[in-house]
From Swiss-Prot:
Pfam families: Dala_Dala_lig_C (PF07478), Dala_Dala_lig_N (PF01820)
Name of the protein in its database record: D-alanine--D-alanine ligase B
UniProt keyword Nucleotide-binding, yes or no: yes
Catalysed reactions listed for this entry: 2 D-alanine + ATP = D-alanyl-D-alanine + ADP + phosphate + H(+)
Amino-acid positions noted as binding ATP in the UniProt annotation, renumbered to this chain: 134-189
Species the sequence originates in: Salmonella typhimurium (strain LT2 / SGSC1412 / ATCC 700720)
Domain ATP-grasp: 101-303
Length: 306
């Protein structure tokens, strides 16, 4: 008898709506591939009961906290249920932009200059040294929560007097935030499925940057796959992404986002260990370019579950 597969979708994070869309698409794709798949929303069902409910494997279509931050992965490990995507450590590291950057920097990989702040430091008032370090980054800046996805809580700061508001917004979403030097782009993303690096995608948002609206709602965001890089640039990008992926210990499938600055240098932005799988999503787009249908993609991801 075929394995009974739980597709985890929805959840309780700020990315719930995106996850519901991802999960519905994954569910349809798995069923098209002949898989006995069923939707499970952790907001409504106690996922600690998955094994008792007769499930043999889990496809994680959750985004954000409680889904791709290592907590769920740890519980599934304890239950002895194979699941898609990266393990506990890689999931936790990838969700945490600050720790990802520290690890990549330590591995000698390029990341944008940044300053990290905690809520306690912000509430106490920034020291002169912190102000000087932020000032040294120049303008514009990008302010982002360390552990939030889908560009939630992110702001581009073009004038110094807008920084305070941007910090306040980011701290609504996390206790730790990043203030980064603005890289002028373009932005690229590279998906990995198993050992296969899929063709890179160049992202061209209509607005200032690739924010929540550009990712999920706008029809004006343009995606180019192939990305239009020459062969040596594409090879350099793929090599960097693979090094970044391995440094974090990622497995299964995922995506690494990268920015090409005006100096011609690629800089790592972040890793996504449970990327979106909606109609606007990038991993399915790259898979299509590589000759893989959506159904083939989700079945392949499920096969990689351990």
């Amino acid at each position: 008898m075929a394995d009974k597969i739980a597709v985890l979708l929805g959840g309780t994070s700020a990315e719930r709506d995106v996850s519901l869309n991802s999960g519905a698409a994954v569910l349809a794709g798995l069923r098209e591939g002949g898989i006995n798949a069923h939707p499970v929303d952790p907001q409504e069902v106690d996922v600690a009961q998955l094994k008792a409910m007769g499930f043999q494997k889990v496809f994680i279509a959750l985004h954000g906290r409680g889904g791709e931050d290592g907590t769920l992965q740890g519980m599934l490990e304890l239950l002895g249920l194979p699941y898609t995507g990266s393990g506990v450590m890689a999931s936790a590291l990838s969700m945490d932009k600050l720790r990802s950057k520290l690890l990549w920097q330590g591995a000698g990989l390029p990341v944008a200059p940044w300053v990290a702040l905690t809520r306690a430091e912000f509430e106490k008032g920034l020291s002169e040294e912190q102000k000087a370090r932020i000032s040294a980054l120049g303008l514009p800046l990008i302010v982002k929560p360390s552990r939030e996805g889908s560009s939630v809580g992110m702001t581009k700061v073009v004038e110094e007097n807008a920084l305070q508001g941007a910090l306040s917004l980011a701290f609504q979403h996390d206790d730790e935030i990043l203030i980064e030097k603005w890289l002028c782009g373009p932005e690229f993303t590279v998906a990995i499925v198993g050992e296969e690096i899929l063709p890179s995608i160049r992202i061209q948002p209509a607005g200032t940057f690739y924010d929540y609206e550009a990712k999920y709602l706008s029809d004006e965001t343009q995606y180019f796959c192939p990305a239009g890089l020459d062969a040596s640039q594409e090879a350099a990008l793929q090599s960097l992404v693979l090094q970044a992926w391995k440094a974090l210990g990622c497995t299964g499938w995922g995506r690494i986002d990268v920015m090409l600055d005006s100096d011609g240098q690629f800089y790592l932005l972040e890793a996504n260990t449970s990327p979106g799988m909606t109609s606007h999503s990038l991993v399915p787009m790259a898979a299509r370019q590589a000759g893989m249908s959506f159904s083939q993609l989700v079945v392949r991801i499920l096969e990689l579950a351990d």
